[in-house]
Amino acid sequence: SVGFKAGVKDYRLTYYTPDYETLATDILAAFRVTPQPGVPPEEAGAAVAAESSTGTWTTVWTDGLTSLDRYKGRCYHIEPVAGEENQYIAYVAYPLDLFEEGSVTNMFTSIVGNVFGFKALRALRLEDLRIPPAYSKTFQGPPHGIQVERDKLNKYGRPLLGCTIKPKLGLSAKNYGRAVYECLRGGLDFTKDDENVNSQPFMRWRDRFLFCAEAIYKAQAETGEIKGHYLNATAGTSEEMIKRAVCARELGVPIVMHDYLTGGFTANTSLAHYCRDNGLLLHIHRAMHAVIDRQRNHGIHFRVLAKALRMSGGDHIHSGTVVGKLEGERDVTLGFVDLLRDDFIEKDRSRGIYFTQDWVSMPGVLPVASGGIHVWHMPALTDIFGDDSVLQFG
């Protein structure tokens, strides 16, 4: 009989495989790993691969009932981060079978669910994911995408213009609708609910939807253009969220909105499916993203959250503004803006893109430049984002 030794064993014996040739169907991850003092980088990288796939802290008899070689994550390459002491990029390959089809939720639960609290690591950041076509093809993706949106709106060859209604909290529904009308009548394409406008005591969601619809139709009639207001459908339960989206559809408005990180990927994917089935555009706000992506050496980089959103579904997503910040940030932002819009994006480490990403024919997402921008930023914004973007003022 084949016996085995119980007890704690090094992960690198099983999960560090520098000679592994990655498969076209593997999901690849690049982690920025900061090991605890005294932990070798190979062990830290292997620990990440193990804990986010099949591993546990010892050998168990049930390991013999499956094929670890078929299902284990593998740390296949480690490189030191230039200019950082004791920090490494660990590349991990995951077999496709570890993931449920069409579930961003399951993908994140597997890859980042458990491993970030790991004792052997001082800090861990997921920098990038390579999503193979074999996996991305199991997702619907954006409800409509850039081209279909332009056809719906009949607006071509320029960025779309929007603004957020302020004060974001405290207006009555009627006064809110009045502000929406003034903005749309004045020439904007879109106005927007703020991310925290849901259904508060001073303005219940249905009242807001009705007055905003009235404002949209009045502005459309007077300008001869198609107008929209991002009606925030985010709610405390996914059933209530869908109820609000149904109401928006019945009013005949073109677009609804969702806070995808606070609302969650499961709710977001449900809403995206509803929007495609019912001809609604879907605007995505990234409230809470900085909790996850702000630290340089711990968390998840926004480019991963952006890729996940393209799979889960959204037609617009907030992507920062670049204006007035550091130059390096510009390249990194443009990197994930391309990941949102383009079909095929080459690996380019100078822009933070660790893997070549092939989306095949998944529709693109319009990046939304929003937050503290005003008319003087216009030349810079059109230079940075080009035509396929939404410039969201106010």
Swiss-Prot record:
SUPFAM superfamilies in alphabetical order: RuBisCo, C-terminal domain (SSF51649), RuBisCO, large subunit, small (N-terminal) domain (SSF54966)
Other known facts: The basic functional RuBisCO is composed of a large chain homodimer in a 'head-to-tail' conformation. In form I RuBisCO this homodimer is arranged in a barrel-like tetramer with the small subunits forming a tetrameric 'cap' on each end of the 'barrel'.
Keyword Lyase: yes
Cofactor: Mg(2+)
UniProt binding sites for substrate: N114, T164, K168, R286, H318, S370
PTM sites of type N6-carboxylysine: K192
Name of this chain's protein: Ribulose bisphosphate carboxylase large chain
Keyword Lipoprotein: no
Role summary: RuBisCO catalyzes two reactions: the carboxylation of D-ribulose 1,5-bisphosphate, the primary event in carbon dioxide fixation, as well as the oxidative fragmentation of the pentose substrate in the photorespiration process. Both reactions occur simultaneously and in competition at the same active site.
Swiss-Prot/TrEMBL GO biological process terms: photorespiration; reductive pentose-phosphate cycle
Residues the record lists as binding Mg(2+): K192, D194, E195
Residues with site note (Transition state stabilizer): K325
Active site: K166 (proton acceptor), H285 (proton acceptor)
Species this chain originates from: Barclaya longifolia
Gene from which this protein is expressed: rbcL
UniProt remark on cofactor binding: Binds 1 Mg(2+) ion per subunit.
Record keywords: Calvin cycle, Carbon dioxide fixation, Chloroplast, Lyase, Magnesium, Metal-binding, Methylation, Monooxygenase, Oxidoreductase, Photorespiration, Photosynthesis, Plastid
Cellular-component GO terms for this entry: chloroplast
Subcellular location: Plastid, Chloroplast
Subunit structure comment from the entry: Heterohexadecamer of 8 large chains and 8 small chains.
Family: Belongs to the RuBisCO large chain family. Type I subfamily.
In-chain residues carrying the UniProt-annotated modification N6,N6,N6-trimethyllysine: K5
GO MF annotation list: magnesium ion binding; monooxygenase activity; ribulose-bisphosphate carboxylase activity
Pfam families: RuBisCO_large, RuBisCO_large_N
